[in-house]
């Protein structure tokens, strides 16, 4: 279906015809743990990857399969894997790339959970990370070592929506024979497609814009199918014969789907962060309206940024749409249709004023999620980024007076009136 446009692909890929078993037009929920093989040879072929198809519910499911095909198509990738959460998608990606004590170079202004994973959890398993200012290309390239296995970025940093120059960083990664991993959760394939700018692997917390309604946890890994893992010799778990899977080389067996197939067949098999069929179904409902929602998110965000930038009780608005933002040129280059509906602003005062503002909002919900159709708010320094010390907070551009907003799809006049209520309380 590659000839179709995004808005059509988000509705049809993976189920181009009615369901063959039931003639259902909607994607059915295949609520089963296992699948009957036609005969013994059929079973052996499935387990040997000679025949693509369902083996066991921990690895694959027909509802999940539609979600994977659809996200691969929307991102322009060769294959995808859906998982139980975005955290699982990121963890499996790093583990697959940096097994046996590898090293990662990562943008320092990333989601607090990803920062903790890379800075504190994975080092206990021999995987270490150097965090860099992604705007300083010399610093980024200088952090690459002999055992570096990937460069990791977010298209829009969390929580300040700062933007790395993906084209330039992809060039550095490939110069050193490394894949570029991009978390496109906030960008979404509707607004930005990392593979078109040199990325090799894309991850998502599908919980956010993909699902869009705050109902369902999920994660996605998509690969471009273009990175040659055999040539570099740095990824033997994918390119060399794998002793835990009949000596198969995933690279030789499935080529452009080798990366996600390795994760499915080995890491998911052994550690089981499986997405449920019902969760896959709910995420598919979100995918079908992705473009429509993102247009409204972007439209509302533009008006809220304009409102906040002129408000006397606001010290600073951290949004790349503003001409004085250091990433404004990159925003215009990579996000011509708008975006960055998750961003921060600094209120005049400190934590007390920030809390008072938040506690007097009505439409905005105080919770840890983002990218919902409902508008959301939180105080990062005391919640999502509370594990960071003051130096780490400052490195990520977060102060005690910083407030994160996630702009929803409500009527813009109601959103702005609610923000005014918060300001009136301080």
State where each predicted segment sits.
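Active-site beta-loop-alpha junctions enriched in small/polar residues
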Residues: 156, 185-187, 322, 348, ...
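N-terminal "arm"/small-domain region of PLP-dependent enzymes with the aminotransferase-like
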Residues: 2-61, 69-70, 403
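Short hydrophobic/aromatic beta-strand micro-patches
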Residues: 222, 344-346, 406-408
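Conserved N-terminal alpha-helix of the aminotransferase class I/II PLP-enzyme fold
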Residues: 39-91, 113-120
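Conserved small-domain helix->loop->beta segment predominantly found in fold-type I
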Residues: 271-274, 278-280, 285, 289, ...
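Conserved PLP-enzyme active-site core in the AAT-like
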Residues: 2, 10, 14-18, 79-310
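Well-ordered beta-strand positions enriched in small/hydrophobic/aromatic, beta-favoring residues
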Residues: 151, 219-221, 317, 343, ...
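PLP-dependent enzyme catalytic core of the Aspartate aminotransferase-like
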Residues: 78, 119, 128, 146, ...
């Amino acid at each position: 279906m590659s000839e179709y446009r995004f808005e059509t692909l988000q509705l049809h890929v993976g189920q181009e015809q009615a369901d063959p078993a039931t003639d259902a037009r909607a994607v059915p929920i295949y609520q089963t743990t296992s699948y009957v093989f036609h005969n013994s040879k059929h079973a052996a072929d499935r387990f040997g990857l000679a025949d693509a198809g369902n083996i066991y519910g921990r690895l694959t499911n027909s509802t999940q399969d539609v979600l994977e095909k659809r996200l691969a198509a929307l991102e322009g990738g060769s294959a995808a894997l859906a998982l139980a959460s975005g955290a699982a998608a990121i963890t499996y990606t790093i583990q697959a790339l940096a097994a046996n004590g590898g090293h990662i170079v990562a943008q320092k202004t990333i989601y607090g959970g990803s920062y903790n994973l890379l800075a504190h959890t994975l080092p206990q398993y021999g995987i270490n990370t150097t965090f860099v200012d992604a705007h300083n290309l010399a610093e980024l390239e200088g952090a690459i070592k002999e055992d570096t296995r990937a460069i990791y970025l977010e298209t829009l940093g969390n929580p300040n929506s700062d933007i790395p120059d993906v084209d330039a960083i992809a060039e550095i990664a490939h110069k050193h024979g490394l894949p570029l991993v991009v978390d496109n959760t906030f960008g979404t394939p509707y607004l930005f497609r990392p593979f078109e700018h040199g990325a090799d692997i894309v991850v998502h917390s599908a919980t956010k814009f993909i699902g869009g309604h705050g109902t369902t946890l999920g994660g996605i890994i998509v690969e471009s199918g273009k990175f040659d893992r055999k040539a570099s010799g740095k990824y033997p778990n994918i390119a060399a014969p794998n002793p835990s899977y009949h000596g198969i080389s995933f690279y030789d067996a499935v080529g452009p789907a080798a990366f996600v197939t390795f994760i499915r067949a080995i890491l998911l098999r052994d550690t089981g962060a499986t997405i449920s069929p019902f969760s896959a179904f709910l995420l598919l409902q979100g995918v079908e309206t992705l473009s429509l929602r993102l247009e409204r998110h972007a439209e509302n965000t533009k008006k809220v940024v304009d409102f906040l930038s002129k408000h006397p009780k606001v010290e600073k608005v951290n949004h790349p749409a503003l001409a004085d933002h250091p990433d404004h040129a990159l925003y215009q280059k990579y996000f011509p249709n708008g975006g960055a509906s998750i961003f921060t602003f600094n209120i005049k005062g400190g934590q007390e004023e920030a809390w008072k503002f938040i506690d007097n909002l009505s439409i905005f919900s105080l919770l840890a999620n983002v990218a919902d159709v409902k508008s959301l708010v939180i105080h990062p320094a005391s919640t999502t980024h509370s594990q960071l010390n003051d130096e780490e907070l400052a490195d990520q551009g977060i102060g005690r007076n910083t407030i994160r907003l996630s702009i929803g799809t409500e009527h813009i006049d109601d959103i702005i009136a609610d923000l005014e209520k918060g300001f009136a309380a301080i």
